[in-house]
Amino acid sequence: MERIMFRAKIHRATVTQADLDYVGSVTIDQDLLDAADILVNEKVDIWNITNGNRLHTYALSGPRGSGVIGINGAAAHLMRPGDMVIIAAFGNFSEEEARTLEPKVVLVDAKNRLLELQPV
């Protein structure tokens, strides 16, 4: 049996832009994607700490070092620049893999610069 397990998150990032007219997705600074081991086009959940909204979308790469967390498309109705969010990724793992999984937690500062990688 496979289990769906939490495997990585970017914790308490700040939304820097919201573009209602973009087709969809979330644009994330490539440095943060690398730190969290999230791939371009990978499904992610976004949990808005500021207002409680939650959604599923997919990740796009933003410029390295930019700190960009850009909410695109219809999701821009749910999240605004300045909102604090958690961006999480999950994966399917065998029973054995699930029991030894060590998720990555990427902690960022107010400008979405990497502060620390922290295991759960």
Swiss-Prot record:
Q: Which keywords describe this protein according to UniProt?
A: Autocatalytic cleavage, Cytoplasm, Decarboxylase, Lyase, Pantothenate biosynthesis, Pyruvate, Schiff base, Zymogen
Record-linked SUPFAM superfamilies? ADC-like
Positions of modified residues (Pyruvic acid (Ser))? 25
Q: Which GO terms describe its cellular component?
A: cytosol
Q: Which organism is it from?
A: Deinococcus radiodurans (strain ATCC 13939 / DSM 20539 / JCM 16871 / CCUG 27074 / LMG 4051 / NBRC 15346 / NCIMB 9279 / VKM B-1422 / R1)
Protein name (database record) = Aspartate 1-decarboxylase
**InterPro entries for the chain:** Asp_de-COase-like_dom_sf (IPR009010), Asp_decarbox (IPR003190)
CDD domains assigned to the protein according to its UniProt record, in alphabetical order: Asp_decarbox
